[in-house]
From Swiss-Prot:
One of its GO terms (biological process) is ribosome biogenesis. Keywords: Cytoplasm, GTP-binding, Hydrolase, Magnesium, Metal-binding, Nucleotide-binding. This is GTPase Obg. The keyword Ion transport does not apply. Residues 1-159 form the Obg domain. Its EC number is 3.6.5.-. It is found in: Cytoplasm. GO terms for molecular function: GTP binding; GTPase activity; magnesium ion binding. An essential GTPase which binds GTP, GDP and possibly (p)ppGpp with moderate affinity, with high nucleotide exchange rates and a fairly low GTP hydrolysis rate. Plays a role in control of the cell cycle, stress response, ribosome biogenesis and in those bacteria that undergo differentiation, in morphogenesis control. Mg(2+) binds at S173, T193. Monomer. GTP binds at residues 166-173, 191-195, 212-215, 279-282, 307-309. Belongs to the TRAFAC class OBG-HflX-like GTPase superfamily. OBG GTPase family.
Length: 327
């Protein structure tokens, strides 16, 4: 499984350069005053959201990042150069947590958004600062400050307008494929989708992202299966679509499992549930259609039965999603 949605890295900002201890030595001033420049500032460590990144896989091989130190102060009152910042690219949707304090340092939700996670140390003062009427040749200087050093936990939460949530093997991946032309891995066994797949519905003037969330099972909110890993990806979605298999032995129970797991994970997410999509309409049991239609009315939800195999009602579902997003 190459999708990695949590990572731990160490970052070290650059140290500031020390102040210089130098004196002017010019042809006509053999005993010139102090002329040590200040040290340069250390480089900072910056995390930046990049839409071309979709996983933390890069951090499997490199977990320690060090920015450049500032240069020491130079003769003739020349300051040392500042150390270069190091910019680490992460997926859009990355939350950055300081492991030691548990503080959230930043939440990178837009492409190009950046956050300084470790500040470079200030440069030290050269001896030019320490001349006094009674000491014209000071050898005093100050050391550069140490750059910040941190251990960071990175958590990726998928950002999608709509998340398709369902039990394993209900046909979510196939539905995403026919809705968006995304190409998720599809096979006829549970847990084919081991990470969120994203697709895009494009209209004349807008586009909407849809995420196929890996199958949720009973007690997912307690971590059953990969429940907590999966459920966190629905938090940012504007709307949740519940996918229920119309050929299931007990579609009402399937619905109840999904609603319960979402509620127990975060009850505020329930208000995002707007729609039940009945999948596998081509092999549906008639009584299941009736049961889900009745259930949807009781819960004030919309019900749309579809077949990804035959394409029945797929265009209608696209229009429905477009209208939903436009309200």
């Amino acid at each position: 499984m190459n999708f990695i949605d949590i990572a731990q890295i160490k970052v070290k900002a650059g140290d500031g350069g020390n102040g210089g201890v130098y004196f002017l030595r010019e042809k006509y001033r053999p005993y010139g005053g102090p002329a040590g420049g200040d040290g340069g500032k250390g480089g900072s460590v910056i995390l930046q959201a990049d839409s071309s990144k979709t996983t933390f896989l890069d951090f499997k091989y490199k977990r320690h990042f060090v920015a450049q130190n500032g240069e020491h102060g130079k003769p003739k009152n020349q300051h040392g150069k500042n150390g270069k910042d190091i910019v680490i690219k992460v997926p859009v949707g990355t939350i950055v947590i300081d492991k030691k304090t548990n503080d959230v340092l930043c939440d990178l939700v837009k492409h190009g958004q950046s956050c300084v996670v470790a500040k470079g140390g200030d440069g030290g003062l050269g001896n030019a600062h320490f001349a006094t009427p009674t000491n014209q040749t000071p050898r005093k200087f100050t050391h550069g400050k140490k750059g910040e050093e941190k251990e960071l936990i990175l958590i990726l939460k998928t950002i999608a307008d709509i998340a398709i949530v369902g039990l394993p093997n209900v046909g979510k991946s196939t539905l995403l494929l026919v809705l968006t032309n995304a190409h998720p891995k599809i096979a006829d066994y549970p847990f084919t989708t081991l990470y969120p797949e994203l697709g895009v519905i494009k209209t004349d003037d807008k586009s909407f992202t849809i995420a196929d969330i890996p199958g949720i099972i009973e007690n997912a909110h307690k971590g059953a299966g990969l429940g907590l890993d999966f459920l966190k990806h629905i938090e940012r979605s504007k709307y949740l679509v519940l996918a229920i298999d119309l050929s299931s032995e007990n579609p009402v129970k399937d619905f109840e499992i999904l609603i319960t797991e979402i509620y127990l994970y975060d009850k505020s997410l329930i208000q995002k549930v707007k729609t039940i999509v009945g999948t596998k309409l081509d092999i549906a049991k008639k009584e299941n259609l009736e049961l889900l239609e009745k259930l949807a009315k009781e819960k004030s939800l919309d019900f749309i039965p579809v077949s990804s195999t035959t394409g029945q009602n797929i265009e209608y579902l696209k229009e429905y999603i477009t209208n939903l997003m436009n309200h």
